[in-house]
């Protein structure tokens, strides 16, 4: 205790963290943090033919290896982020982790809310939905921040994640996993 403190108990406090504040499940975390912008992007299946800093149509790959990801739809890929130019585009990711988080925000060019739908192995997440998504996989980007999209229960396995944006003018920055 600090010298001179009076009336301070020695008991410890229990802190319960929810959502993205909960500690990562390190024993089942096999997928690393991933940046979407070309300055730091790794394991991306769709950038080999990309034209950076201009609109480009990306095809959805038929299959991804573990920790590989891809854009689909028309995006402008910039150094730190990618911005969706037309509705119906999204990101697919083959991952192995309990939680999927994505840092994203509305683009400066006017959108105030961008609705999205997430799927895991092609289906709505159901009970595996994160705090920013309902059981049907629906959510909305309203500001630039980290969104918790998936929170699975055990057993954790390699899974296919997809986020599809129902309107354009969203920016995606990075994935984190827990």
Regions found by a protein language model. Give the residues of each.
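Non-globular targeting/processing and membrane-anchoring segments
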Residues: 1-178
